[in-house]
A protein has these predicted regions:
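N-terminal extracellular/periplasmic Venus flytrap/periplasmic-binding protein-like
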Residues: 10-13, 25-35, 43, 169-272, ...
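Conserved beta-ketoacyl condensing-enzyme motif
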Residues: 23-114, 119-135, 191-204, 297, ...
Length: 403
């Protein structure tokens, strides 16, 4: 079986996911995705026609994101008529799932060189814009005990004793780490500025960061999911699934949850032979990738099991992994992972995460993989894991090793 190598990874800066003041709102999703594809080609000099496929994650593929955005982006990026493209959706895990699918095809020798990644323009198409019957159809949601992710995050906090202070302290640290990373230029190599048609830069840094965040400002925010959970009966569903609880403690709000943003990312994956033919230098190999399903009410704890399986598949233990990236969907998700996996906080999300910089749903998985690889090189670390939870109880984890 062939190795699947990572040759490069790029991402756009994340723009605020709001129509009124998001810097990227006027950029089309196709253009944003095409920009990452074009950057990969220009940085590495491979012939576009050498690419066997383009695989992009997109969670809400409707309106401006509809019509197989991967194929359209490949055409717009100048990859030529012969390069196909496919859009996939595993909710928030979509960007990393695209990488896993690309790696599987390379390992199976079904393809030699693939661009994988994702795109999501949340300022144009809001979360759930493509419809989500697991939440909106009571005939599906109630019998299967489906609840919104924010309520699931509060359920995790309630079950495991994470207080409002705990989740706010984690959020504040994410903001501090992200601000430090940007100040020290840790994202410079992989973040490509977004420009307009005249070449003027529209955005070159993550727009949604709030480096001034402190415990006082976080403490002033009201819980975001309490009213909705009680009014719509989601608290009752959670307590039916977890009767050991007397009630839910709602601790999550806008300041300790992932931010709604626009963004795109792309990763160049291929075989050693393809790399040699194209003059590419490999940066890492993909050792394993595992996607799982887990209990859908609590929903967001899946990264623990996905990570354990991915490590077992790679023949490694937790102690063998030097750096970790876990998508900060909500603060309790990371606190639970730290508790169950036994990773110290100084080895995970060392440059901040989605609480500080945002979570462009279909792109985040590819983004955090690139962030992980950049930090592994900067800090001279050998092994890393990228992992995300996803809606309806899914999760993915990928293990990489520098070469």
């Amino acid at each position: 079986m062939a190795e699947a190598l990572i040759f490069d990874a790029v991402r756009t800066p994340r723009g605020k996911g709001r129509a009124k003041d998001g810097a990227l709102h006027e950029v089309s999703p196709v253009s944003l995705a095409a920009g990452t594809l074009r950057a990969l080609q220009e940085r590495n000099g491979f012939a576009p026609e050498a690419v066997d496929d383009v695989v992009l994650g997109c969670v809400d593929p409707v309106k401006d994101q509809a019509g197989d955005i991967a194929r359209t982006a490949a055409i717009v990026a100048g990859y030529g008529d012969a390069v196909p493209g496919v859009q996939i959706n595993r909710f928030c895990a979509s960007g990393l799932e695209s990488v896993a699918l690309a790696a599987s095809r390379v390992k199976a020798k079904d393809a030699d060189l693939i661009v994988a990644g994702g795109v999501e323009m949340m300022s144009r198409i809001g979360m759930g814009g493509s419809g989500m019957p697991v939440l909106t159809d009571p005939a599906i949601a109630m019998p299967n005990m489906m609840i919104p992710q924010g309520v699931s995050a509060d359920l995790i906090a309630s079950l495991h004793g994470f207080s409002r202070t705990d989740v706010d302290a984690y959020a504040m640290e994410s903001q501090k780490r992200a601000a430090t990373a940007w100040r020290e230029g840790r994202f410079t190599d992989s973040v490509i500025p977004v420009t307009d048609r005249t070449g003027v830069t529209i955005l070159d840094t993550d727009e949604a960061m709030r480096p001034e965040t402190d415990m006082q400002s976080l403490g002033a925010l009201n819980p975001a999911f309490e009213g909705m959970a009680k009014m719509a009966g989601f608290d009752a569903v959670a307590l039916q699934a977890y009767p050991e609880l007397e009630g839910l403690v709602h601790v999550h709000h806008a300041g300790n949850s992932s931010q709604i943003v626009d963004g795109a990312a792309a990763v160049l994956i291929g075989s050693a032979d393809a790399g040699e033919r194209a003059g590419l230098t490999p940066r890492a190999r993909i050792l394993s990738s595992v996607s799982i399903g887990s209990e859908p009410t609590i929903m967001l704890t899946g990264p623990v099991e996905a990570t354990r399986r991915a490590l077992a598949k790679a023949g490694l233990s937790v102690d063998d992994i030097e750096l970790w990236e876990l998508n900060e969907a909500f603060a309790s998700v990371v606190l639970y992972f730290l508790q169950e996996i036994g990773v110290s906080h100084d080895r995970i999300n060392v440059n901040g995460g989605a609480i500080a910089m945002g979570h462009p749903l279909g792109a985040t998985g590819a983004m955090i993989l690139g962030t992980l690889l950049d930090e592994m090189e900067r800090a001279d670390r050998k092994t890393g894991v990228a992992t995300l939870c996803a809606a309806s109880g899914q999760a993915i984890a990928t293990v990489i090793e520098r070469v």
